[in-house]
Amino acid sequence: LKYLDRHITPRIKEALKFSPIVFLNGARQTGKSTLVQAIAKDLPSGGDPAPYVTLDRPVLLASASSAPEAFLTGYHGRPVIIDEVQLAPALFRALKIVVDEARTKEGDSASGKFLLTGSANILALPKLADPLVGRMAILTLYPFTAAEATYNISGGIERLLRLDFKNVSDRGFSLMDVIKKATFPEIVEASVENRRTWFDGYITSILQRDVRQISELEKISLLPHLLSVLATRVGGVMNDADIAREVGLSSVTGKSYRGILKMMFLTLDVKPWHRNVGKRLVKSAKGYLIDTNLICHLLDYNIDDVALTKPGLFGSLLENFVATELVKQLSNSDVKAELYHFRTSDGIEVDFILERPDGSVLAIEVKKAETVNMGDFKGIKVFQELVGKDFIGGVVLYSGKDVAPFGNNLWAVPFSVLW
């Protein structure tokens, strides 16, 4: 696979202009190392590309852990890239000291000194993140978006929020092709068999090795089973007691272990939308996995077979695909919006809500069928009535090819608007 320009690159370069430390986190194998090494060429360090060091190397890890300040000052104030930084927790306090000294000496020119990467969500590790409040910009790199994987520029989420559906085209890529490609860079072009082998190794290395490095879990062997159970529940409201019971854990432990999977960027939660609107709303998050192909692997299904023989599961996979696309595109772009789901206690629901900082909201429903009718807007119309003037519009994403209006700011739009 040739190097694909990642859509988050401008955000990283912009952050390096203003922040002394930029932390790029994300799951293992999302392409962080490749990306930061490409950026290193544009980060001059005494005329050369910025040095790149990875703490996966035992000697460098020993140095960073036992003499963190010496490790950092050894670069004499030049920009440096440090990969897998969560492996050396001692570095974070040392970074604070080194950055504060640089700010005292250099003022604004202390920006862009450290570009860090890590495979665990730094915000879930407050002991590490707290010393660097106000000194560090945090960005997240996910697996390929649909647009990245099909060599297009970004912009799907912007089009949705503007209700700009002119010239929506699949550009010759089928929905199934795109779901398979919008995955981890290493397996974009891999065969079904090679993907299976890769995912087996990937899950083992994260759940057996990486988790041990940041957390002491008594029943670590149950994590793969927990991940598989969550794969059967994608798009469902998360009930921690129920999930824990199925895995064989107490409710408290189950919730904690689910937090670990989220921290390693294997799963994600979509929070419930809430506002004082005079209706009782469900207050639990919906759960998804970070990669739709990973779900198929865990359930031992080929996605093409699922589409033909298991319509219910295929609907859940499509919802997972849209959830991850929205999360990835929000992470990559400057669009300011939060992702939620909407569900009332009497069962009226909308799959996704995008809320802008000004309170304006877009409702998105996912439908696997190739046609749309007015009934598919039922939940969206209830939501529209509740939010009134804050309603931007409602979109039903579906498997057909035509954009069609269904009322004032209500649209049926092909999935291909995402790529």
Where are these regions (language model features)?
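Interdomain motor-coupling "hinge/lid" segment immediately C-terminal to the ATP-binding subdomain
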Residues: 125-232, 236-237
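Hydrophobic positions on the alpha1 helix immediately C-terminal to the Walker A/P-loop
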Residues: 35, 39
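Pre-Walker A adenine-sensing motif
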Residues: 1-16
